Amino acid sequence: MALPNKFFLWFCCFAWLCFPISLDSLPSRGEAQIVARTALESEAETWSLLNHLGGRHRPGLLSPLLEVLYDGHGEPPRLQPDDRALRYMKRLYKAYATKEGTPKSNRRHLYNTVRLFTPCAQHKQAPGDLAAGTFPSVDLLFNLDRVTVVEHLFKSVLLYTFNNSISFPFPVKCICNLVIKEPEFSSKTLPRAPYSFTYNSQFEFRKKYKWMEIDVTAPLEPLVASHKRNIHMSVNFTCAEDQLQHPSARDSLFNMTLLVAPSLLLYLNDTSAQAFHRWHSLHPKRKPSQGPDQKRGLSAYPVGEEAAEGVRSSRHRRDQESASSELKKPLVPASVNLSEYFKQFLFPQNECELHDFRLSFSQLKWDNWIVAPHKYNPRYCKGDCPRAVGHRYGSPVHTMVQNIIHEKLDSSVPRPSCVPAKYSPLSVLAIEPDGSIAYKEYEDMIATKCTCR
């Protein structure tokens, strides 16, 4: 029964395609010129909108792709980040993203946001004792207003970045003493018991450093989870006294702790719909036929059942081959050549396909806060959809039904449109209004496939 049904469906589609199109549905030359002029005016209006995106008043017809990037960045940053911190984040961007701005597929991290904060206040607290291996303590205050409620902390580090590599003649073992304090409250607030958390981290200085990271996830995780916006901490280093006898080792640590202000680096997972969620791409759904035993080369069936399954599959393949050979037989005489006639319907000249739309953020006057990528190609879908949409577009049967309704029953029902079907994410490195730096991965920012719907 399957073969006659397929033949009947094919015959109906064949008859529909052969049916001549009414003259009323063909646009006149004057109408075509009007349509072309309207398209040009629409394109000019789009460019006009793009050219005014940098203004203070955001247009209401802003493309959703660009609105994600523009949101909250109507003006240039009030503060500029430290040059050393910016170089570090640029290096991080190159490690995480391609030149086109898409996240690298070989990265296996589960976070999609990295934020770097420089201290908004810093002052020396205690002089220290270099002879005993204790270096001066430094008070730091970080403002985390840019961290949203949908961003969950994965990891946090104190980052020391240097203009020049710091060298040590031999490895030096040290302990970082971190004291996190409750921010001071005004006299109007109710008094509360002072909060203080002490955290020690052991590490080792080696020969050359351009930057150094100290993991502070344990003390900061409850504060970020409770949406604390001001983090007040005191940092000092204590190193083995016998290892600081060499003057170069002592001078390197002294310059690092006093002359270089550390930054706070937060690795976060943005759970909003706009963010790219790498978890789905790292854990695809396993097919039912692929069991753990099959991956190791073992069969999931006993010998008898496996043989029976092989016989059934081979018989099924023969049935499919015979059915396909019947369908491949021509339904019309070979002398009638309709290939040129069908070509205008099945393969239109302006076929639905991807087109490039390359722009630079300097055109939009966004280059003062978007650090990378410098250029963006969101791509778009444009073209005519064929009357009989094939498997190449992945369109549902409803698309063909809509075409039939438009041509045979009601012309007010629109034809299927050429629209994006798949997207890829985009990695963006941006300077926030408060001077912090953010690396973010946004979902559905670059069209990669078109379809007719």
From Swiss-Prot:
Keywords, comma-separated and alphabetical: Cleavage on pair of basic residues, Cytokine, Disulfide bond, Glycoprotein, Growth factor, Phosphoprotein, Secreted, Signal
Name of the encoding gene: GDF9
Chain's role: Required for ovarian folliculogenesis.
Residues that make up the propeptide removed upon maturation: 28-318
Protein name, entry field: Growth/differentiation factor 9
PTM note: Phosphorylated; phosphorylation is critical for GDF9 function.
Disulfide bonds: 352-418, 381-450, 385-452
Region ranges (Disordered): 304-328
Positions glycosylated per UniProt: 163, 236, 255, 269, 337
Basic and acidic residues bias spans: 318-328
Any one GO cellular component localisation term in the record: extracellular space
Example GO molecular function: cytokine activity
Quaternary organization: Homodimer or heterodimer (Potential). But, in contrast to other members of this family, cannot be disulfide-linked.
Family, as annotated: Belongs to the TGF-beta family.
Cellular location(s): Secreted
GO biological process terms held by the UniProt record: negative regulation of cell growth; oocyte growth; positive regulation of cell population proliferation; regulation of progesterone secretion
UniProt-listed SMART domains: TGFB
Highest taxon in the source lineage: Eukaryota
